[in-house]
Amino acid sequence: MSSRRWFHPTISGIEAEKLLQEQGFDGSFLARLSSSNPGAFTLSVRRGNEVTHIKIQNNGDFFDLYGGEKFATLPELVQYYMENGELKEKNGQAIELKQPLICAEPTTERWFHGNLSGKEAEKLILERGKNGSFLVRESQSKPGDFVLSVRTDDKVTHVMIRWQDKKYDVGGGESFGTLSELIDHYKRNPMVETCGTVVHLRQPFNATRITAAGINARVEQLVKGGFWEEFESLQQDSRDTFSRNEGYKQENRLKNRYRNILPYDHTRVKLLDVEHSVAGAEYINANYIRLPTDGDLYNMSSSSESLNSSVPSCPACTAAQTQRNCSNCQLQNKTCVQCAVKSAILPYSNCATCSRKSDSLSKHKRSESSASSSPSSGSGSGPGSSGTSGVSSVNGPGTPTNLTSGTAGCLVGLLKRHSNDSSGAVSISMAEREREREREMFKTYIATQGCLLTQQVNTVTDFWNMVWQENTRVIVMTTKEYERGKEKCARYWPDEGRSEQFGHARIQCVSENSTSDYTLREFLVSWRDQPARRIFHYHFQVWPDHGVPADPGCVLNFLQDVNTRQSHLAQAGEKPGPICVHCSAGIGRTGTFIVIDMILDQIVRNGLDTEIDIQRTIQMVRSQRSGLVQTEAQYKFVYYAVQHYIQTLIARKRAEEQSLQVGREYTNIKYTGEIGNDSQRSPLPPAISSISLVPSKTPLTPTSADLGTGMGLSMGVGMGVGNKHASKQQPPLPVVNCNNNNNGIGNSGCSNGGGSSTTSSSNGSSNGNINALLGGIGLGLGGNMRKSNFYSDSLKQQQQREEQAPAGAGKMQQPAPPLRPRPGILKLLTSPVIFQQNSKTFPKT
């Protein structure tokens, strides 16, 4: 689990019950400090309408449930029982930990880095900070406490911040009501270590990693000036350190639309079906873009907190790898793209010792060790006592993490797949198998420039050669052919109903349909008289000539349709290749679309408690093609688009929770009608004739699978199109429709819908109220039947519709509020806990 936001350090058992009843659902859980046993913890889980409390023992060396598996940290314990489901009552009933109930950050200040280990904090500050740079993070060993990490010359000092009696202190001296007050105090009054070193808090080291659910607070902070600061930092870090020799060659220069926007050599697409005797025949200005592994290079969660982290190498391999890696690798605990290319390391290229170790390694390891103060190369940490006024500090690395060997992963396999270099340590067939395995989990993109068609050069043929070679079935064009009187992209397709030959490619435009935001064209493409393939061309046409779109919803809707198409092609067995994205230069708008889709894809897989890092994601994709996300305005737009998506998702979940409380049962909800006849509807073929929504013991709230198909933004496609790799932590999300027959109660949420619809209208009063509630959110339909205004409706409009809905209902009887069990009676579960693995029953405590 990438976040520990399920830990609520300040609430009691009564408050935990109330919180779970009001905001949670079946399977929601949180962890808190024990009210009866200082130093221990309690896991509170909602099961139906009851809340079960499970005691967690902490003896100073390990955490356990009074028996069973032992864990070094509380996050390891929670992660284990979420994934393995071995927690049962004595009567055999399972206690499922489905979805964490997120706790608000203790502060919105950007110097707070959340669940960051001491080792990671040291690397960040020593690599990128200055003398006096500081940050605050959560304590790895004592949940509920925090650590202040400060750079003092060539070392990092860690000062423990205690949470006691609803106050913060550093082990002595004054107490403060908030972390901000504490930091402000020690900015003015520096601490002094026992060795005499003065610890100055000069400048904050601001975080870019955040919990997805907390994006509103982060955007509010960035609006004050942080956007410019983050983007400028990104510009300085994204130096061109990769070769672009092929693009500079004389025979290839005319193929570049812009002289200095060239593809990196290590990720560029190479054309195979060409006349190799012609110099530069295999060159095209295009790069592969993808995540090397799940969250690799930008999901900065500590590997020591993950039970599924990579197996550590033997000392020889680790030392050799560490010596080869650059400072950026050390910073991220991962092998960066450049080092991966230089050394051609794959995860399975370790020595025999490492392979044997991977078979026998236990799942649970100690992730922390104690040590005294050390310089930047230190190896351990532990709480100590120093300072002139009882300041508790930790002088040295806080939480050492296991170095991973060769975590460049699938990306290297991908690069070697398209490389003429056969000297790598691993065969092409092994890289192919690895690439196929991870292709199922992560999308690959091709970022390229707009086509050129002049008397001197024609790249249209090369473009279609690449599309055919890569089996690309979806092309995303984010620019007009002409903007401000200048050609941005040559037309590389024929008019509707016509065919055209481009070299060996024959293109037939079968259909062309337009919405208010984009045009969808369907092509039949054949190459060298081979059987034709269906290829879909999504042409986004409302990006303004200057700046970015005012409404992120239009981009989210567009990406939703793109990903829905890609997922349907995969289900049809066509095995679509990378999504090809281009604008004019292939870096600005192209990068913006790709990064938004990557971030949302992560949220779809891991839920709202996942930690995202927009700046680091852009830094990662820029290591594969230079300049992606070109301007500060585009950088802001990525934040706003992700924020809009999360706000809409949260509003949708709340609406569905409220609908469940009313108690109505919906069945036979059908979506019918022709698609494509209305220019305002999504131009997609009909694929879902009827969807039934029936009551179940499982609460109808979103799962990771139901949030999408693993294709980023395919909302609702989980009704049979779920991503098999999606996390199980999210609850199921039903597809619902507005009722158009209840005196207009839900109609505003159904405008511009993706096809006609009919709903069951029995018991009109409560049915109308629920549909008004759900209709006001503007829910997107599953599969091909998308509500075109799902993301575009602002939350303010949604709230207005919800407030107006009861008035529009006239004299319709309002449903009685649902009955809830009164919180206050703690059902402490201390004895009936059974662990399936060992079939043990543990005694009462």
UniProtKB/Swiss-Prot annotation:
GO terms for biological process: cell differentiation; dorsal/ventral axis specification, ovarian follicular epithelium; epidermal growth factor receptor signaling pathway; epithelial cell migration, open tracheal system; fibroblast growth factor receptor signaling pathway; imaginal disc development; MAPK cascade; mesoderm development. Changing residue 749 to S: In strain: Ann Arbor1, DP CN BW, Kakamega-b1, Kakamega-b3, Kakamega-b4, Kenya-HLa3, Kenya-HLa6, Makindu-b5 and Reids2. The active site is at 583 (phosphocysteine intermediate). It is an enzyme of class 3 (hydrolase). SUPFAM superfamilies: (Phosphotyrosine protein) phosphatases II, SH2 domain. It is found in: Cytoplasm. Residues 227-645 form the Tyrosine-protein phosphatase domain. Its main location: cytoplasm. The keyword Cytoplasm applies. Expressed uniformly throughout all tissues during embryogenesis. Pfam families: SH2, Y_phosphatase. Substrate binds at residues 545, 583-589, 630. Disruption phenotype: RNAi-mediated knockdown in glia results in significantly reduced inhibitory activity of drpr isoform A on glial cell engulfment of axonal debris. Its EC number is 3.1.3.48. Interacts with drpr isoform A. Belongs to the protein-tyrosine phosphatase family. Non-receptor class subfamily. This is Tyrosine-protein phosphatase corkscrew. It comes from Drosophila melanogaster.
